[in-house]
């Protein structure tokens, strides 16, 4: 159910685009994200900061798309969101000496500091790359191709990256009885 709630706005955006075009799809995405946040707030009592950020970005860039009647703004939305997330990880690591990936996942998994650092850098690089890739598709292909990439390509690449991260983590996770990860044992 959580996955459906997470993908609710993008699924509706995609469907609306196929039927009515980019401007109606943009309005639908804004409304769906507002409904999504309202549902999460009612159901769980708390909305995560990333969800608020996503709402702010869709309202800002979607609103600009509708007001200016220019699809350029909505095409920039994923890039801005990716770069904000990657930038947050980067600033956290370099400026505040805080690994936000470890802060998010540290209670669920026990890893050595270098592995946490590699995860943080990996996600930072992934978000930066996805932002550039989104712009490349947006400016080199038609809007229909960009929408398909946004749904299928973006989610597919995210899924592949998560699997790669899981494989990387599986080499370093401590077993219940182990004192150290497999690759760090003498």
Curated annotation (Swiss-Prot):
Main location: membrane
This protein's record includes keyword Transmembrane: yes
Subcellular location: Cell inner membrane
Membrane-spanning segments: 10-30, 47-67, 76-96, 121-141, 149-169
Domain of life where this protein originates: Bacteria
Pfam families, per the entry: IspA (PF04279)
Keyword Chaperone: no
InterPro entries, per database record: YciB (IPR006008)
Membrane topology: Multi-pass membrane protein
Protein family: Belongs to the YciB family.
Function description: Plays a role in cell envelope biogenesis, maintenance of cell envelope integrity and membrane homeostasis.
Protein name (database record): Inner membrane-spanning protein YciB
Gene: yciB
């Amino acid at each position: 159910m959580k996955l459906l709630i997470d993908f609710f706005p993008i699924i509706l955006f995609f469907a609306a685009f196929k039927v009515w075009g980019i401007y109606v799809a943009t309005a639908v995405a804004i409304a769906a994200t507002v409904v999504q946040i309202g549902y999460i707030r009612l159901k769980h009592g708390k909305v995560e900061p990333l969800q608020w950020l996503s709402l702010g970005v869709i309202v800002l860039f979607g609103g600009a798309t509708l007001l200016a009647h220019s699809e350029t703004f909505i095409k920039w939305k994923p890039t801005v969101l990716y770069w904000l997330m990657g930038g947050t990880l980067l600033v956290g690591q370099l400026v505040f000496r805080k690994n936000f990936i470890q802060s998010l996942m540290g209670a669920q998994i026990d890893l050595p500091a270098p592995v946490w650092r590699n995860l943080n850098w990996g996600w930072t690089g992934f978000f930066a790359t996805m932002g550039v890739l989104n712009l490349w598709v947006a400016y080199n292909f038609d809007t229909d191709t960009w929408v398909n990439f946004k749904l299928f390509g973006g989610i597919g690449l995210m899924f592949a990256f998560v699997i790669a991260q899981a494989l990387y983590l599986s080499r370093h996770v401590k077993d219940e009885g182990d004192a150290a990860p497999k690759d760090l044992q003498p």
